[in-house]
């Protein structure tokens, strides 16, 4: 059996079996304890969390600043690379144009040289053919004259004509 010391009605320290009164007293004790002891504990946790969040924000801002600077530097480098590429492209165009003009000039000069050479060869061949035709015509004329003259000329006139023909052939 339960000893009478546990009951409050007996006048000693005991258990209060009235649940509503007991719960109100217990809630008052718990609320007072939470009010007294919880703020420093929860405040410390919240303060540490606030410091961590501020540190994370500061770190994120620093990384954003570095990334922004890196992006600006990369954009500047890209612009410089585009400018250099454009300069190289322009230089190549100018060089290609100079090479093309030089090639055209050399081609025209070579064509003129070949034309002069062909003209000189043609003139030389024409001169040679003309000289050969003159010699052949002179030879044939002399042969015809010599074959026709023996009956028409005397020996002195014939000798003089042969000498003059030989002299003319030597000059030609």
Curated annotation (Swiss-Prot):
Q: Name one Pfam family in it.
A: ATP-synt_B
Which cell locations does it reside in? Answer: Cellular thylakoid membrane
Q: Which InterPro entries match?
A: ATP_synth_b/b'su_bac/chlpt
GO terms for MF: proton-transporting ATP synthase activity, rotational mechanism
The record lists the membrane-crossing segments as 27-47
Question: Which keywords does the record carry?
Answer: ATP synthesis, CF(0), Hydrogen ion transport, Ion transport, Membrane, Thylakoid, Transmembrane, Transmembrane helix, Transport
Per the record, the domain of life is: Bacteria
Provide the membrane topology annotation: Single-pass membrane protein
In the record, the note on similarity to other proteins reads: Belongs to the ATPase B chain family.
Which NCBIfam families does the UniProt entry name for this protein?
Answer: PRK07352.1
Q: What does this protein do?
A: F(1)F(0) ATP synthase produces ATP from ADP in the presence of a proton or sodium gradient. F-type ATPases consist of two structural domains, F(1) containing the extramembraneous catalytic core and F(0) containing the membrane proton channel, linked together by a central stalk and a peripheral stalk. During catalysis, ATP synthesis in the catalytic domain of F(1) is coupled via a rotary mechanism of the central stalk subunits to proton translocation.
Question: What does the subunit comment say?
Answer: F-type ATPases have 2 components, F(1) - the catalytic core - and F(0) - the membrane proton channel. F(1) has five subunits: alpha(3), beta(3), gamma(1), delta(1), epsilon(1). F(0) has four main subunits: a(1), b(1), b'(1) and c(10-14). The alpha and beta chains form an alternating ring which encloses part of the gamma chain. F(1) is attached to F(0) by a central stalk formed by the gamma and epsilon chains, while a peripheral stalk is formed by the delta, b and b' chains.
**Protein name per the record:** ATP synthase subunit b
Native source organism of the sequence: Prochlorococcus marinus (strain MIT 9303)
Q: Which gene encodes it?
A: atpF
């Amino acid at each position: 059996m339960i000893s009478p010391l546990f009951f409050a009605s007996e006048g000693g320290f005991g258990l209060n079996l009235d649940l509503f009164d007991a719960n109100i007293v217990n809630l008052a004790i718990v609320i007072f304890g939470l009010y007294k002891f919880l703020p420093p504990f929860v405040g410390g946790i919240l303060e540490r969390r606030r410091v961590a969040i501020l540190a994370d924000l500061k770190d994120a801002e620093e990384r954003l600043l570095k990334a922004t600077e890196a992006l600006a530097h990369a954009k500047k480098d890209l612009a410089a690379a585009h400018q250099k590429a454009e300069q190289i492209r322009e230089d190549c165009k100018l060089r290609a144009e100079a090479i093309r003009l030089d090639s055209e000039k050399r081609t025209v000069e070579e064509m003129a040289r070949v034309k002069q050479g062909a003209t000189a060869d043609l003139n030389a061949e024409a001169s040679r053919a003309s000289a050969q035709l003159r010699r052949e015509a002179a030879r044939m004329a002399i042969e015809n004259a010599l074959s026709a003259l023996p009956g028409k000329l005397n020996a002195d006139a014939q000798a003089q004509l042969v000498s003059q023909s030989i002299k003319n052939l030597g000059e030609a």
